[in-house]
């Protein structure tokens, strides 16, 4: 315990520790947001298709989801600091492999597998190491900064990816990640390890059940856009007339239920569980985890919708799109840093509720501002509000979840917390995308159907084509496709008008569901403590 006091007591050491942990969180969040703007370039470079690169992104998410809870337990087995450093080394090798990848299989090995496994060790360890390096009164600020670093990475990722793709190569992003890993490892020597009790044995059956349950559930969610949530899309797999997505999600939930039953059995036999089911009966912990889920659902939904509007509807480059998203980082960092510092005794429940309302307000303001004639400037105020909400939540939720359990269980909580945020992020992106595409399809067909200038043959053909899925196209992309098809000027103009209206309708619908979800989360804030929590004693 002396090492913990020393690390927390020295301002210089505390800053170095916080820098190392925040840099780790930043690195974990940077990957996907960077690559989303570079998919086509990566596909061309490694000799594959856009679908192949999207599959690599999906695989990275799956690997993290599957190994996050076991990764938290590994930290209890070998030490949280060692797990953090080993995770960084694995992640660094993954980044180097990705930077040098000549083809898709090597990209999958480096990016999807090695980086995914590294992240599953790093993220739970960060949660435990913040708890062990900072006293209770400074923990909320530390968790806020670490969480803010991850959110800022998502916000600046498109800008970094745009700069790299435009002026250098996407490969330099991963070279930069290797350099960051080396820097983190140099700083990590100052980190005080979390206290480790008796070395537990890894529950292999529990690890398998949790990995399969989370993996199958997340895979189902990630396939929803391609296969359909309930009603299967044409040529999509189904069973009993229902999309395979439903069956995969149900199978995942069944496996997670079996996992919890198995863990309860382990406890009854006085054996070390992977996750103690008693933790999930902790009102404060489940409250914090639930709010983490909703935060990441709304947050990632917004990060899906806003770049689409800027890059496709307005035709901005990746560089300009990234620059327009940057204002979010200002209020996010300000709230995450200043709330714990200026209001150390403020009610966490009140801050969380205000943060949720800021998310809701940001989504509603953006929804109201969307218009066919609007410019990129309309996203600034909504993003400032959303950043404020994200920062407010980041300033409280980490401390709320970890302080709900003894410090010896902090890595376990870290694994569960990151699994929950992974689920929220996956569902948020998939839900926003599905609502957007479904609304676009309906709006486009309705507008075309009501237009007398469009021949009935074209209307029928459009219906058949769109039932199999509609892409989110810019006017330039649609006009090019229509010109190649040899359509008349009247039909082209009608289609462009319908596409413009459909895009706005789809974006508004996606934002509406995100705003509704934010409001829904308010009903779960009663589980957040009304006073600043202090760490539970071991």
Residues covered by each model-derived region:
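Transmembrane-helix exit segments and adjacent C-terminal regions of multi-pass membrane proteins
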Residues: 1-21, 25, 264-265, 271, ...
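Flexible interhelical linker loops that connect adjacent transmembrane helices
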Residues: 8, 185-214, 227-240, 265-283, ...
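Transmembrane core module of solute transporters
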Residues: 14-64, 68, 169, 239-248, ...
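Structural signature of transmembrane alpha-helices in multi-pass secondary transporters
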Residues: 21, 28, 57-60, 64, ...
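Small-residue (Gly/Pro/Ala) motifs that create kinks and tight helix-helix packing interfaces
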Residues: 39, 153-165, 307, 339, ...
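C-terminal module of multi-pass small-molecule transporters
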Residues: 74, 78-93, 97, 101-109, ...
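Helix-loop-helix hairpins in multi-pass membrane proteins, especially solute transporters
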Residues: 76-214, 223, 232, 240, ...
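C-terminal membrane-cytosol helix-exit motif in multi-pass small-molecule transporters
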Residues: 178-196, 213-226, 251-267, 521-529
């Amino acid at each position: 315990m002396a090492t913990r006091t020393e690390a927390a007591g020295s301002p210089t050491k505390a800053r170095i520790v916080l820098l190392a942990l925040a840099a780790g969180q930043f690195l974990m969040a940077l990957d996907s947001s960077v690559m989303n703007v570079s998919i086509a370039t990566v596909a061309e470079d490694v000799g594959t298709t856009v679908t192949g690169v999207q599959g690599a992104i999906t695989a990275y998410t799956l690997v993290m989801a599957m190994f996050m809870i076991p990764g938290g337990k590994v930290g209890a087995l070998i030490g949280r600091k060692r797990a953090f450093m080993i995770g960084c080394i694995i992640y660094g090798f993954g980044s180097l492999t990705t930077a040098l990848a000549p083809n898709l299989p090597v990209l999958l090995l480096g990016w999807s597998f090695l980086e995914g496994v590294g992240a599953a060790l790093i993220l739970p360890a960060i949660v435990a190491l913040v708890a062990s390096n900072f006293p209770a009164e400074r923990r909320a600020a530390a968790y806020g900064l670490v969480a803010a670093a991850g959110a800022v990475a998502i916000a600046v990722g498109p800008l970094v990816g745009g700069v790299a793709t435009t002026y250098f190569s996407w490969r330099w992003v991963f070279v930069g990640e290797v350099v960051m890993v080396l820097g983190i490892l140099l700083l990590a020597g100052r980190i005080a390890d979390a206290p480790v009790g008796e070395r537990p044995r890894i529950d292999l059956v529990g690890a398998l059940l949790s990995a399969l349950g989370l993996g199958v559930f997340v895979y189902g969610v990630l396939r929803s856009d391609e296969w359909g949530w309930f009603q299967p899309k044409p040529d999509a797999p189904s069973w009993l007339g229902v999309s395979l997505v439903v069956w995969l999600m149900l199978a995942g939930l069944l496996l997670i239920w079996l996992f919890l039953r198995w863990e309860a059995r382990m406890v009854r036999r006085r054996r070390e569980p992977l996750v103690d089911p008693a933790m999930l009966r902790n009102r404060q912990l489940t409250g914090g985890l639930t709010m983490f889920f909703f935060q990441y659902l709304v947050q990632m939904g917004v990060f899906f919708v806003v770049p689409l509007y800027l890059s496709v509807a307005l035709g901005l480059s990746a560089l300009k799109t990234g620059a327009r998203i940057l204002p979010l980082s200002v209020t996010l960092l300000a709230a995450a840093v200043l709330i714990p510092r200026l209001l150390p005794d403020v009610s966490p429940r009140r801050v969380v509720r205000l943060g949720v309302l800021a998310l809701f307000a940001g989504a509603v303001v953006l929804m109201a501002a969307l218009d066919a004639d609007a410019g990129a400037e309309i996203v600034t105020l909504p993003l400032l509000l959303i950043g404020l909400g994200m920062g407010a939540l980041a300033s409280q939720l980490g401390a709320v979840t970890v302080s709900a359990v003894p410090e010896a269980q902090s890595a376990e909580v870290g694994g569960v917390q990151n699994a929950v945020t992974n689920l929220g992020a996956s569902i948020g992106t998939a839900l926003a995308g599905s609502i957007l595409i479904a609304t676009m399809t309906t709006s486009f067909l309705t507008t075309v159907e009501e237009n007398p200038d469009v021949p009935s043959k074209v209307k029928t053909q459009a219906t058949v084509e769109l039932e199999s899925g509609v892409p989110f196209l810019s006017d330039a992309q649609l006009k090019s496709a229509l010109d190649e098809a040899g359509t008349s000027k009247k039909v082209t103009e009608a289609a462009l008008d319908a596409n413009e209206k459909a895009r706005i309708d789809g974006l508004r619908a996606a934002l509406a569901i995100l705003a509704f979800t934010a409001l829904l989360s308010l009903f779960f804030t009663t589980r957040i403590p009304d006073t600043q929590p202090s760490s539970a004693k071991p």
